[in-house]
């Protein structure tokens, strides 16, 4: 039997992830009028563009919900965000600028915590506002069924009856007005925004065109650093980690990591730090484009990565980066709690993050322009005296280096022989005008 219901299950409890926006408000009221028993569940993810969370469940009750709950997801969201940071679970980058997977992290938390709350209320049918072309429909599907194997999925936006009756925002707004609710449709923006405490995503509409750039976006977590009229003063900030956990900013210790991240957002946001423009592959392999904000995570990541490179050896760092990219893809695909993801994450947290103790001082300027001013850690393996060009007691002598270089003759000879073979079989065409090495046979030809 399919877990996806294509028509409204009348007479049954249906949980809906309720944001309080037009789409979910109209869907909830429509389900009530059509004979379902809707329950509303709102996730408090610390969205920077949400002013009054307590009012959202109240509105759901007004629109016909049989029950409405506000679930505080902030602590879990930050915990998962720091876990992603510790394991470098970020696979989307452009020219060294990173997308911090803030929406996928938010979906992992929302999808599990809301369905767990529904299960407590005996609600085994779940709906949300994700569309069939996006990533979220699959992410929520996976996370929901992980938590509740008996879960059925009903999405109004996959129900043709709902689409025929309320196919667009104008129709939904008129539907709410005719139902007696003074619901005023918000002004249309040139793009769509989704946010949580970790970051914001701006996409769709005008941003679907690659001829539209970051300048059409109005940041909600920082400043428009590209505008000449936005004054941004350089600022020095220190970030301290202990055993892989961020614990202090500018010497102020935080016992609550939610509060620490909020302060990191304020600091980074003053400079527009962590904004990026990315073209990515959705789960279904089609490409999409997004403008992202993540000022706090970006600030923490600069300090964390600096300590990683100063503490760990090259092979460990290589594994951390390779596994981080793999883990980032799994996170993006809605597999954050799959066994293979847990294995990669736990490995990084145990063998990389636990050694990360220290303090980094950073100068922030505009956007992603910054300088690292100092790095301190009791665990640093960076020892400049080993390689000092001054006359100091050395860990090895000139004769030691002569011996090491002499041993390199073996692989240099092997490389020369292989290049000769490639030339003989026509893979290389050496010549004076070629950038390839000049390979001569034994005869000197």
From Swiss-Prot:
Do the record's keywords include Zinc? Answer: no
Give the pathway: Amino-acid biosynthesis; L-arginine biosynthesis; L-arginine from L-ornithine and carbamoyl phosphate: step 2/3
- UniProt binding sites for L-aspartate: 131, 135-136
Residues given in the record as ATP binding sites:
17-25, 43, 129, 131, 136, 194
Binding-site residues for L-citrulline, renumbered to this chain: 99, 135, 139, 192, 201, 203, 280
Q: Where in the cell is it found?
A: Cytoplasm
Q: Which InterPro entries match?
A: Arg_succ_synth_type2_subfam, Arginosuc_syn_C, Arginosuc_syn_N, Arginosuc_synth, Arginosuc_synth_CS, Arginosuc_synth_type_1_subfam, AS_cat/multimer_dom_body, AS_multimer_C_tail
* GO CC field: cytoplasm
Specify where it is mainly localized. Answer: cytoplasm
User: What are the alphabetically sorted keywords of the record?
Assistant: Amino-acid biosynthesis, Arginine biosynthesis, ATP-binding, Cytoplasm, Ligase, Nucleotide-binding
Recorded superkingdom? Bacteria
Q: What is its EC number?
A: 6.3.4.5
Gene Ontology terms, MF aspect: argininosuccinate synthase activity; ATP binding; protein homodimerization activity
Lipoprotein as UniProt keyword? no
Q: Which reaction does it catalyse?
A: L-citrulline + L-aspartate + ATP = 2-(N(omega)-L-arginino)succinate + AMP + diphosphate + H(+)
Any one Gene Ontology BP term: urea cycle
Q: How does it assemble?
A: Homotetramer.
The UniProt similarity line reads:
Belongs to the argininosuccinate synthase family. Type 2 subfamily.
Return the protein name: Argininosuccinate synthase
Identify the gene encoding this protein.
argG
């Amino acid at each position: 039997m399919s877990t996806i219901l294509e028509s409204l299950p009348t007479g049954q409890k249906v949980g809906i992830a309720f944001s309080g926006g037009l789409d979910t408000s109209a869907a909830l009221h429509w389900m009530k009028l059509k004979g379902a028993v809707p329950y509303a569940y709102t996730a408090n993810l610390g969205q920077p563009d949400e002013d009054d969370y307590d009012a959202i469940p109240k509105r759901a009750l007004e629109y016909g919900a049989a029950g409405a709950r506000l679930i505080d997801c902030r602590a879990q969201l930050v915990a998962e965000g720091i876990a992603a940071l510790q394991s470098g679970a970020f696979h989307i980058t452009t020219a060294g600028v990173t997308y911090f997977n803030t929406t996928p992290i938010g979906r992992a938390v929302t999808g599990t915590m809301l369905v767990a709350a529904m299960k407590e209320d005996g609600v085994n049918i779940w709906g949300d506002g994700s569309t069939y072309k996006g990533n979220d429909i699959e992410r929520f599907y996976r996370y929901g069924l992980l938590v509740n194997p008996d879960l059925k999925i009903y999405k109004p936006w996959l129900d043709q009856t709902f689409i025929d009756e309320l196919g667009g925002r104008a129709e939904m707004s008129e539907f709410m007005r005719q139902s007696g609710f003074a619901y005023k449709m918000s002004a249309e923006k040139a793009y769509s925004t989704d946010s949580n405490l970790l970051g914001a995503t701006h996409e769709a509409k005008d941003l679907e065109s690659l001829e539209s750039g970051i300048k059409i976006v109005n940041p909600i977590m920082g400043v428009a650093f590209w505008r000449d009229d936005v004054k941004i003063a350089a600022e020095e900030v220190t970030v301290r980690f202990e055993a892989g956990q961020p614990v202090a900013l500018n010497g102020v210790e935080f016992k609550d990591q939610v509060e620490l991240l909020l302060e990191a957002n304020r600091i980074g946001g003053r400079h527009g730090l962590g904004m990026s423009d990315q073209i990515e592959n959705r789960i279904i392999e089609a490409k999409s484009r997004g403008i992202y904000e993540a000022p706090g995570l970006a600030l923490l990541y600069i300090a964390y990565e600096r300590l990683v490179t100063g503490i760990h050896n090259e092979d460990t760092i290589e594994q951390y980066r390779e596994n981080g990219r793999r883990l980032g893809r799994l996170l993006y695909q809605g597999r954050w709690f799959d066994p293979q993801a847990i294995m990669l994450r736990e490995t990084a947290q145990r063998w990389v993050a636990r050694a990360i103790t220290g303090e980094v001082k950073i100068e922030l300027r505009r956007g992603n322009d910054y300088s690292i001013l100092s790095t301190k850690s009791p665990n640093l393996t960076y020892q400049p005296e080993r390689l000092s060009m001054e006359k100091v007691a050395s860990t090895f002598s000139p004769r030691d280096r002569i011996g090491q270089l002499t041993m390199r003759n073996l692989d240099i000879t092997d490389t020369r022989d292989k290049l000769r073979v490639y030339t003989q079989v026509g893979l290389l065409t050496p010549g004076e005008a070629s950038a390839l090495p000049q390979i001569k046979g034994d005869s000197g030809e």
